[in-house]
């Protein structure tokens, strides 16, 4: 399997530098604890190099635009082969950079098209005590035990044509795992019981966004007017 240091090694090395004396806060979902991209840590380094402000660096196989999530001493991330046929979750020890779990979750015989500026592992996972929830869009969603890496449940029945590749990250609200699917054929929001993976509710949405199948606009529309002096 092809192994590359970018983008994940660079992200992990840059984000998990040594902070003294207190460790940085957990980062459990896309854009952090409150989903707003705000980090409360202060006095962080502004420069990095191979010998400066890097505690460890770990190469991760595959290609992914998803963000790592952090809880306690674990850093979890998703990755995929560049052809989209193998989709994985990886857990790294926060203090040492050692890989704890490297789990191939889904195999996809005929991956959908994915734009070159996207990846087959772009949705960021969401983690809570004892469980992590990962999704790759239509190819599959899974809940894992963070200690053992065991798959607690999975779903592969949310089908849509992602057109340019999946990118929507899940969120947790109370007992629900909520996901958004914006396909060119089907669009919907679905809420799952986070403990069992069973569907609690699903809301369909219109797919009329005035694009043709080739991606070219059906018509030109003016959405705003601006005066510039």
Kindly label every feature range from the protein language model.
Residues 22-229:
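Noncatalytic, solvent-exposed loop/strand surfaces
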Residues 8-9, 37:
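A periodicity- and composition-biased signal for non-globular, repetitive helical segments
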Residues 9-18:
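Bacterial N-terminal signal peptides
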């Amino acid at each position: 399997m092809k192994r590359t240091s970018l983008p994940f090694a660079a992200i992990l090395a840059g984000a998990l530098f040594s902070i003294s004396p207190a460790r940085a806060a957990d980062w459990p979902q896309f854009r952090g604890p409150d989903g707003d991209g705000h980090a409360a840590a202060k006095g962080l380094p502004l420069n990095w190099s191979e010998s400066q402000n890097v505690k460890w660096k770990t190469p991760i196989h595959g290609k992914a635009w998803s963000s790592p999530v952090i809880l306690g001493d674990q850093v979890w991330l998703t990755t995929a082969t560049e052809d989209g046929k193998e989709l994985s979750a990886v857990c790294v020890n926060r203090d040492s950079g050692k890989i704890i779990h490297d789990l191939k979750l889904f195999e996809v015989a005929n991956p959908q098209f994915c734009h070159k500026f996207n990846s087959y592992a772009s949705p960021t996972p969401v983690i809570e005590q004892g469980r992590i929830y990962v999704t790759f869009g239509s190819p599959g969603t899974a809940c894992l035990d963070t200690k053992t890496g065991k798959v607690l449940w999975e779903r592969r029945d949310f089908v849509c044509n992602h057109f340019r590749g999946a990118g929507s990250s899940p969120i947790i609200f109370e007992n629900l795992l909520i996901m958004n699917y914006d396909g060119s054929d089907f669009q919907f929001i679905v809420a799952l019981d986070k403990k069992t993976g069973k569907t609690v509710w699903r809301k369909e949405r219109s797919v009329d966004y005035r694009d043709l199948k080739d991606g070219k606009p059906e018509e030109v529309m003016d959405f705003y007017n601006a005066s510039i002096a």
